């Protein structure tokens, strides 16, 4: 299985690694990370308008101008112009490098631990390794997630930039505000990882039955497998993702100190169960283009850097 799946970026921060580097590739780790960071930067920038629309639909679900994707995008352009569709993208790109580096490192340590017990890695061990990698990375970059949400939601002139946004949050709410939404974020990892990896494994089995060589899969096979498994993972964990975003943005909306239980109750009382899936349309729409852009840029970067991926 090619290592390119490790860093295929669909713009979803909970995305778990599906494979790890072989021993022969250890010396070129920085090339994989650089390729992945560049691929993620291009794909996230390309789909940033959909991501900003998603956040607005999640947070301002009661406003009529954000009831659907097109009206939401129109409202954003009217408020701040076309360039405003990329608000929050800078820090979203900035956090890619540490995010990937942490996931790689934790996954490698987990692989070494499990391989010390027996020679092959079981499905449940892959879930544990993937979940742990995401949990550690999200714990360390959660402050950047909060800043990204606030910058994405800002209106024209609210913040002078990233540092000004961080300063205002710290002055008003203290350091604890930088970990708003942490609990639902952690809880969302388990359903995401289990669903993502289960669907991915199922697709690998189906491709093998169809006669595909999974030791050296084609780009279409790799992209379709990761895209579908990621989409299923997002749907499984989406209510928790929505609650996390609402908690991170709560001061922007109501000026209160939100709790996970309180946000859940408010959504259910005001919008019912469908309210837990507000913003799902732009989320699903950006998975395929984000994955496709990421894959193409990643392969191009590997060629540029002279990386040879060894099959198992």
From Swiss-Prot:
Segments traversing the membrane: 33-50, 88-107, 131-144, 182-200, 219-243, 279-298
GO cellular component, one term: mitochondrial inner membrane
Keyword Zinc: no
Assigned keywords, A-Z: Membrane, Mitochondrion, Mitochondrion inner membrane, Repeat, Transmembrane, Transmembrane helix, Transport
Any one Gene Ontology BP term: ATP transport
Tissue-by-tissue expression: Mainly expressed in testis and at lesser levels in brain.
Pfam families given in the database record: Mito_carr
Catalytic reaction list: Mg(2+)(out) + phosphate(in) + ATP(out) = Mg(2+)(in) + phosphate(out) + ATP(in); ADP(out) + phosphate(in) + H(+)(out) = ADP(in) + phosphate(out) + H(+)(in)
Membrane topology, as annotated: Multi-pass membrane protein
Function: Calcium-independent ATP-Mg/Pi exchanger that catalyzes the electroneutral exchange of Mg-ATP or free ADP against an hydrogenphosphate and participates in the net transport of adenine nucleotides across the mitochondria inner membrane.
The protein's name: Calcium-independent mitochondrial carrier protein SCaMC-3L
